């Protein structure tokens, strides 16, 4: 799978878990990307749960797609 396809897959997973999100993607290399997700606080755990296994599966394939979930109403306080 290409990095672009992996990013698209994770974005669809995020949107399925929480429709009211803002997603920002930064490609770090041909095999690595960082996805920042700004979501309502009530949806943060659902996004983390939904993306955990797909991200692990991508890592096994050699793609490092990191997902960081932030409270869209207070992004600085919830950085993890």
Specify the residue positions occupied by each region the protein language model found.
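Short, non-transmembrane amphipathic alpha-helical segments
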Residues: 10-14, 45-63
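A short interface-forming secondary-structure element
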Residues: 35-49
């Amino acid at each position: 799978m290409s990095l672009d396809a992996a990013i698209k897959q994770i974005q669809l997973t995020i949107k399925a878990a929480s429709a009211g999100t803002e997603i920002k993607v930064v490609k770090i290399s041909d095999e690595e990307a960082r996805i920042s997700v700004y979501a309502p606080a009530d949806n943060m755990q659902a996004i983390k749960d939904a993306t955990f296994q797909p991200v692990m599966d991508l890592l096994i394939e050699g793609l490092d797609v990191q997902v960081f979930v932030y409270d869209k109403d207070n992004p600085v306080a919830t950085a993890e």
